[in-house]
Amino acid sequence: MIRYFTAGESHGPALSAIIDGIPAGVAITKEDIDRELRRRQQGYGRGGRMKIEQDSAEVLSGIRFGKTIGSPIALVIRNRDWENWTDKMAQFSSNEETTEKISIPRPGHADLAGRLKYGFNDIRPVIDRSSARETAARVAAGSLARTFLRQLGIEIGSRVASIGSAEDTGSEGPLRSLLEHGAETLSEAADRSEVRMIGEAAGIEAMASIDRAKEQGDTLGGVIEIFITGVPVGLGSYVQHDRRLDSQLAAAVMAVQAIKGVEIGPAFDNARKPGSEVHDAFTLMKGEGVRRPTNRSGGLEGSMSSGEVIHIRAAMKPISSLQSPLQSFNLDTLEPVLSRFERSDTCAVPAAGVVIEAVVAPVIANALLEKLGGDHMDEIRERLERYREALRSAFTG
């Protein structure tokens, strides 16, 4: 089973991750990790922090001569901004009493609940750990599972469907065409847009919306679509709640900062339609097995993969740090005041797509390993091919 933990604060010396359970024999390069870190830093509407950081992972263990060795993989990503925060975020110092304390919580953030929960007299520890800066470590961790899946013919990609009121509604045809070549082909096309939209006109409208929001001291959220191609039938299970693949994917997506909604396929649209217009009919294709002319189930039936493209939609709320602050109060004096502003982005929807790609990768990898078992890449590859052949054979004759 693949599992990982992250550590580190936004303005501390570094972020780190320990990833356990990656099988031995997975060929991986440092560029496989750093490429995803660069993708996470891109996107129209990002803040000044992205001009400071140039994220790159240091691998401390678990990889030898370009291949995983089955032991835990430890990664470190240095925070270049740390040099500006050595006093405020010092691990060992006698300056605590003279360091400025933050006592005004920002609406929409973890500030208030976090300070009350952990009994701090300063909101800074909450801000620095709850920050989306932590997702850099998750992207690095997810890149390992993603590389493992890629070498088995399973690809993960995403695109931005909307930012604010700007919707990329005319890209369904190009989307299907791109997915026929694999989900990463879709991501490559999306990455050519600063807002990761497929439609050029929608992208221009989205950037204009971000510009207006920035001028007004406001922020924007949006909707991201994630696609996973090459997943065989039968990953996940219906027999216990914690083995349901849709619930595992939803949990991973909802654990990303600022994600407030998730659906598998067009779930909320399906809820408004009769069943005859929702469920995907079967077509038996000779030599290919079962196919569906539609995929309104989002590639999951009975909480298991159906063999179609897995399709997830995620809603990201607008970023909570506003240059035009909302009403708040001082926790120390209880006096009403306007909220404070912490350096942030105007819009991080494009980057959120990259993060979600990363967090769903271990979920799919674990479902695959649960089905196939195996400790070495060659063993797993052989078992997967035998399973795929068995699926093909079930519908021949």
Curated annotation (Swiss-Prot):
InterPro entries reported for this sequence: Chorismate_synth (IPR000453), Chorismate_synth_AroC_sf (IPR035904), Chorismate_synthase_CS (IPR020541)
Pfam families: Chorismate_synt
Cofactor: FMNH2
Pathway assigned in UniProt: Metabolic intermediate biosynthesis; chorismate biosynthesis; chorismate from D-erythrose 4-phosphate and phosphoenolpyruvate: step 7/7
Record-level Gene Ontology MF annotations: chorismate synthase activity; FMN binding
Reactions catalysed: 5-O-(1-carboxyvinyl)-3-phosphoshikimate = chorismate + phosphate
A single GO cellular-component term on record: cytosol
Biological processes, Gene Ontology terms: amino acid biosynthetic process; aromatic amino acid family biosynthetic process; chorismate biosynthetic process
Entry binding sites for NADP(+): 40, 46
Positions contributing to FMN binding: 129-131, 257-258, 302, 317-321, 343
EC numbers for this chain: 4.2.3.5
Source organism, top-level taxon: Bacteria
Family: Belongs to the chorismate synthase family.
Function comment: This reaction introduces a second double bond into the aromatic ring system.
Protein name in the entry: Chorismate synthase
Organism whose genome encodes this protein: Chlorobium luteolum (strain DSM 273 / BCRC 81028 / 2530) (Pelodictyon luteolum)
Lineage: Bacteria, Pseudomonadati, Chlorobiota, Chlorobiia, Chlorobiales
